[in-house]
């Protein structure tokens, strides 16, 4: 990682948190007292502070984890927004850009190295693990709080894996997923972990979605998803009337914000300032942006509550990251598979 100068309504598990994750706040006596495995100890030993101002932490999770473990969440009436895009051309190959817009809370840059699935790099809002701003200040010195990070692998907000497959989500007004006969039911955020673990490209990611029944719990905010891969292929995944709809990208680019693409007409798309701004830039450049240009585009559609702006280089496993709209300080990370 290096830092160099450069001149909600979003949620992960379905709904923004009004409070903390109750299950992670209290925990059971067994989970608190259970001895850590060797992989868990090794994982927590990698924890470090990247940027104390947000704060942003980083950790590598080694070994196995349960992507379907339950994490209790509380809903919120607040409405926030996100912006995502694929820029398929340019000197560094396909780029996946993403603004995550939500209230201030600590974040974790998580590298997962499971024993059998793909290695991945993702960002996690750890308030969903019961670590709010105050708890974040104590995290490095509090063993119980650090232990909660072992659940973070289950809830990526956006990320890329070693094959160059990226995924991110944004909230919409409505989503009615199909009930797949005989399929395992998964949460609206956990499906992203399954995609990062199991898919190498967009086609395989779509197949992962089809293997599970995605469920939005009562009170949760519905979502749609953007997929992109190292070949420059992309697709949006939406749920309309009990049907999963797959919307391929328009040539070398794709654009997604907070309305249902598959039911929106052209006037609705153009009336959304963020969508229009991204689409006009990508159309004008034929999707050819370098990482600095992609970050500049994210800055143009950032809002006052933008938590992070991330640009993933899908052929190189690299990420550039700006926190809280500070585009003069850019953090750089690389996923070494």
Question: PLM features: what roles do these ranges have?
Answer:
Residues 13, 22-193, 197-198, 214-215, ...:
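N-terminal mature-domain region immediately after signal-peptide cleavage
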Residues 19-20, 209:
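Generic helix-packing signal
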Residues 8-9, 98, 274:
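Basic side chains
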Residues 1-2, 195:
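Short, flexible active-site loop motifs that bind/organize anionic cofactors or intermediates
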Residues 167, 174-298, 303-306:
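A surface/extracellular/periplasmic glyco- and lipid-processing/surface-interacting theme
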Residues 2-18:
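N-terminal secretory signal peptides and thylakoid transit peptides that target proteins
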